[in-house]
Amino acid sequence: MQTPVSVNEKKDFIRWFLNHYQLKRRECVWILNYLMSHDSLMEKVHFVEQAEFCPRGIIMSTHCVEEVPFRFYKENVMTTDAEKSFHDIRLNKQQDLFIQLNFRSAYSSPEYAAVLESNPHIPKNLFENKKDQGLAEQILEHAISTFQREKLLKDIDDALDRHDKEAFEQLSRQLNQLT
């Protein structure tokens, strides 16, 4: 569905997220900051929907939504103890970690769309209506494309402001490849 999300893109998103939203549990902030401080862990982080279906999934919610504050799933066992999940993350650094973030306007956020990956662990029969699933994927692809284009245009403007010809040319090539 999309190209892999880079470690830097994930870190940029987490920084943006923490600057714009307040999580219901402070331990969630600790976990996200811990993940950001270790590139090897960030390579294993995947932002997804419906993390409860994943072998190792975390659900975190902000104050602006009604969803549960925190849940950690590991092989069909669920806990609300953030310290246990933090311990598991530290001990199992080589395992993929799937994170679902519940926050206001998540589905209209281009920042979130840019790092959101399809969840390979969702049961096939969960999506009864394939037409809706296809439409949702098209909307997500469009949001990602729009976000990438806007980010490149901003970076090009910044390069022009700095009179950085090399960065301008490289970013322009990237923009041309998008279109």
Swiss-Prot record:
Which Gene3D superfamilies has this protein been placed in?
Uncharacterised family UPF0302, N-terminal domain, Virus Scaffolding Protein, Chain A
NCBIfam families, per this entry?
PRK03636.1 (NF002965)
What protein does this entry describe? Answer: UPF0302 protein YpiB
Give the UniProt family note.
Belongs to the UPF0302 family.
* S-S pairs: none
